[in-house]
Amino acid sequence: MGFLWTGTWIVVLMLHSSPIQAFPKPAGSQDKPLHNRELSAERPLNEQIAEAEADEIKKTYPPENKPGESNYSFVDNLNLLKAITEKEKNEKERQSVKISPNDNKLNVEDVDSTKNRRLIDDYDSTKSGLDRKFQDDPDGLHQLDGTPLTAEDIVQKIATRIYEENDRGVFDRIVSKLLNLGLITESQAHTLEDEVAEVLQKLISKEANNYEEELNKPTSKTESQTGKIPEKVTPMAAIQDAFTNGENDETVSNTLTLTNGLERRTKTYSEDNFEELQYFPNFYALLKSIDSEKEAKEKETLITIMKTLIDFVKMMVKYGTISPEEGVSYLENLDETIALQTKNKLEKNVTDNKSKLFAVPSEKSHEETDSTKEEAAKMEKEYGTLKDSTKDDDSNPRGKTDEHKGKTEAYLEAIRKNIDWLKKHNKKENKEDYDLSKMRDFINQQADAYVEKGILDKEEADAIKRIYSSL
């Protein structure tokens, strides 16, 4: 009996020992800290991809269960090495095919549907390649080869754009962009403005000189008639539009007075080139009636004075001294008052001249005067020609000066009376009268500029200054 119990215990011990040999227990307690450390640390992406591929291989091709094998770690390591080798091979193949950054950008943009508009623009025949060359440079601050412009080039380019577009806002937009980007400071912006203004003045002067050279070239009568007055425009509606636009954009006044204004004043005013004066019917009719060649100088003086007053009214509207509606009303009064008073003065001079020079007119002249109204007007023009002080003989220089001065004083007296009338009737809504100090400074500057350009004589400019200083 004791032997039986002994044999039973031996069999039990053998059963307990045999699984240990057939199924070895992994040393989990030793690898646990290493396993936790691997989980907490971030492994390289290539290693994670290789491990994932190894797991795929395991699932797809499970290892064969051979009876003699008790541990598959060797098979796992082999599969892992194969996956890593294949991954490295794929990486090398990708690196061997090099794609330029621009091509890569195009591929990405091809996928992005929001970029299709740029591709459509590429097929637009109206757009040049230079327009798309620097798409992040809308102000054109690069040369054709892509190199940045120098400071002088930028100043020249800004001034040219302002001159071509007749828009002072071009400078403001560019400078505000540079200030927002932090590329320039406030003081540098003021310096840039002065430099651009200087270059812009040179461009205007150059254009004016070119225009004068073209005028000096002989042209046929047919060519000179091509620049006649365009189709009829409602005068005050056009002026009202100009003032209304000026409220929304202060560059309108600059456009009228800076580029076109200075260019106008440097021109020799011909009979068919009165520009905006056609919007003043009374004054324009007066100019058309003064068509004597010997009165051309007085005619140019009258045009210059009228344009100066127009610019002055525009300046008052720009700085808010008067409203656009009041500006239109003032211009209407200028048109009516100056034209009427100047015409009366000229007619009086012509009548006095006729009574002095032709106290006993001949029968021939009497018949011609009574024949038709056209002939009578022609005779009056001839009398006015004889009265022209600028064409008198040199034997009476003092008389010539007095007559010339009297003609100019007649114009200026009409202007003075008109401004006095405006001052008396500008009392609505407690608005201030004209700022006469600004007015005098403005007129003095314009008169000096006209003398330099040869539009006015020194004596005429002094007379204008004297009239305005006495207001």
UniProtKB/Swiss-Prot annotation:
Residues 1-22 form the signal peptide. The keyword Ligase does not apply. It is found in: Cytoplasmic vesicle, Secretory vesicle; Cytoplasmic vesicle, Secretory vesicle membrane; Secreted. Residues 32-45, 86-96, 363-409 have a biased composition (Basic and acidic residues). The keyword Secreted applies. It is a peripheral membrane protein. Glycans are attached at S40, N71, N353. One of its GO terms (biological process) is protein localization to secretory granule. GO terms for cellular component: extracellular region; secretory granule membrane; transport vesicle membrane. Residues 23-72, 86-105, 357-409 are annotated as: Disordered. Keywords: Cleavage on pair of basic residues, Cytoplasmic vesicle, Glycoprotein, Membrane, Phosphoprotein, Proteoglycan, Secreted, Signal. It comes from the Eukaryota. The modification Phosphoserine is found at S40, S365. Member of the granin protein family that regulates the biogenesis of secretory granules. Acts as a sorting receptor for intragranular proteins including chromogranin A/CHGA. May also play a role in angiogenesis. Promotes endothelial proliferation, migration and tube formation through MEK/ERK signaling pathway. Interacts with CHGA. Interacts with secretogranin II/SCG2. Interacts (via C-terminus) with CPE. PANTHER family: SECRETOGRANIN III (PTHR17388), SECRETOGRANIN-3 (PTHR17388:SF2). This is Secretogranin-3. It comes from Bos taurus.
